Amino acid sequence: MARVTVQDAVEKIGNRFDLVLVAARRARQLQTGGKDPLVAEENDKVTVIALREVEEGLINGKILDVRERQEQQEQEAAEMQAVSAIAESRR
């Protein structure tokens, strides 16, 4: 298990407050969102995995925003398609 130094992750994000927000969002995605880790799990907790992803430059706030927007657009498109199918079946 590689040790994560917060200082390395802070340098990637810019400041420790944004690091906390980004790492928490990513850890929540890993825990509940069914997302796959971008680094080897190595029996680490999701918070450590999130910090390692940040440290390696694989995750940052902009990347998370883009991915969430894409997923939201895909979900909205699927919902609109389902609504259209229901409307067509009632005609």
UniProtKB/Swiss-Prot annotation:
Its EC number is 2.7.7.6. GO terms for biological process: DNA-templated transcription. The keyword Transferase applies. GO terms for molecular function: DNA binding; DNA-directed RNA polymerase activity. It catalyses: RNA(n) + a ribonucleoside 5'-triphosphate = RNA(n+1) + diphosphate. Keywords: DNA-directed RNA polymerase, Nucleotidyltransferase, Transcription, Transferase. Coiled coil: none annotated. It comes from the Bacteria. One of its GO terms (cellular component) is DNA-directed RNA polymerase complex. NCBIfam families: rpoZ. The RNAP catalytic core consists of 2 alpha, 1 beta, 1 beta' and 1 omega subunit. When a sigma factor is associated with the core the holoenzyme is formed, which can initiate transcription. Belongs to the RNA polymerase subunit omega family. Promotes RNA polymerase assembly. Latches the N- and C-terminal regions of the beta' subunit thereby facilitating its interaction with the beta and alpha subunits. This is DNA-directed RNA polymerase subunit omega. The lineage of its organism: Bacteria, Pseudomonadati, Pseudomonadota, Gammaproteobacteria, Enterobacterales.
